[in-house]
């Protein structure tokens, strides 16, 4: 029998990528509003470019937040602390253009005290559909390509901030991983792309020689540390700074905006995306909270060994608490003689997907042990610090199918 063979690619970007700088500022602003007032309604967008940060959006809150202070703190934490970067924490301009949220939206979302069930009192913040996904490719139950891509740029940032080796690194970086699959199983890594911003070449060293040093350092200290050795072979291709010199980067090299890295934030293209970005949005916005809940559903279904893959779609109408629809697809991998309809029926009873129930379950209005800024670089999923990654419904799912 012939084997099914194909290639699949995912990419990631570092915390210093301009779009991620914007995401982190937006989420840091959200964190502070929620810290002061857990009932805050926030939709915060950030624009970054050469020497400039603009923060805008809609807010309803009792809190008072120093936007300039937060933006400068985030930029400092990322590492833009030198004037030569043309975007520097202490000297960049910071403009706040936040204003009040529309009362028309408030009317549909805020609590309706006359309704008996408290979880029915809070409507969805908007219409739309959200997706969650899980699979058995990695211990985190995430697609392997995006996990490797995230870990590559995260490792680069760790090395840069430690400052012991590769001291030429600057904050902006991108990664991309191509996997070869045989019969739907990861067989090997076919290609790795890493582009990292760096200092000018040292005096007396040519560009070609400096790029050769960078290539060797990244392969040895980043790629081979992150990617399991058994997946690398003599045919794996390494594209390290493939265009050569990469000195100009960050917001000086490219303008950044909140919400432009939604595939990096999720599953690297291995699963559908409803189109709504996450960062800067409070948890009443189902673009964010329902995507987290959908991941929780999918991950628990896979962790319970009901299927090897699971996609969950949930949809909402603005102002309505209960989902308009829920859809579960195990891509033909359901086990124990189960079908998708059976799994969906049980899941709908076990997982409450009303926005207020989601917020309560994960304490999304009062994060503890994590913050929204943490989500804004290196992925919202596949990281155990986040409550929606818990496999706390496995036993209940198994019991529902008499598998416990």
Swiss-Prot record:
InterPro entries given in the database record: ADOMET_SYNTHASE_CS, S-AdoMet_synt_C, S-AdoMet_synt_central, S-AdoMet_synt_N, S-AdoMet_synthetase, S-AdoMet_synthetase_sfam
Domain of life: Bacteria
PROSITE patterns: ADOMET_SYNTHASE_1 (PS00376), ADOMET_SYNTHASE_2 (PS00377)
Residues that bind Mg(2+): 19
Binding site for K(+): 45
Needed cofactors: Mg(2+); K(+)
Alphabetized UniProt keyword annotations: ATP-binding, Cytoplasm, Magnesium, Metal-binding, Nucleotide-binding, One-carbon metabolism, Potassium, Transferase
Keyword Transferase: yes
Residue numbers spanned by region Flexible loop: 101-111
Pathway: Amino-acid biosynthesis; S-adenosyl-L-methionine biosynthesis; S-adenosyl-L-methionine from L-methionine: step 1/1
HAMAP family per record: S_AdoMet_synth1
Name recorded for this polypeptide: S-adenosylmethionine synthase
